Amino acid sequence: MPVLRSIRERFAAQRPLDGTTVAACLHVTAETANLVRALMAGGAEVALCAANPLSTQDETAAALVEAFGASVHARRGEDADAYAAHVVACAKRRPHVTLDDGADLVSLLHAGGPRSRARLIGATEETTTGLLRVRGLEAEGRLTCPVIAVNEAHAERIFNDHYGTGQSTLDGILRATNLLLAGQTFVVLGYGWTGRGV
């Protein structure tokens, strides 16, 4: 992740996020760990919980805590009660910014009283489902900060949908079937951004 590494180095020198609290409800993976490290290098206090307990990499969560001093509330396979408690733990940090995958964190902050979201100045949401929840808050007149719809960004379609999903799809097929691709015939249903990546 050379771009993120470059940002982390610049952030470490400039510290643009000093005094900023970031709460993230994302997949706890090595990729997310690099994002957390970049934010922390920039001076942010970061609290991370899992957007999906089944994707949590326990070794990554442990490394973030032990090697980098991050606040991580996640465990692979945690039950619904533990998941909810971990989202609450991040919300209790009274973040300035949230990074969400499913809108659990930003929704919880808006369900609480004004004090719970008093410092909230912005958020990001990665998923279509999460954006439906955010737009519901907006329609009710309850959304108190701008939310960046990551999933609707042109760069998301180009890089993640096209290249990332294409790569992940082929990788998943290869791992699940143990087939050699040479000489195989594939049928790709749909030929949008994602289908072209496959």
Language model features by range: what are they?
Residues M1-L17, L48-Q184:
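Glycine/serine-rich phosphate-binding loop and adjoining beta1-alpha1 elements at the start
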Residues L26-G43, E156, N160, G164-V198:
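Glycine-rich phosphate/diphosphate-binding loop of Rossmann-like nucleotide-binding domains
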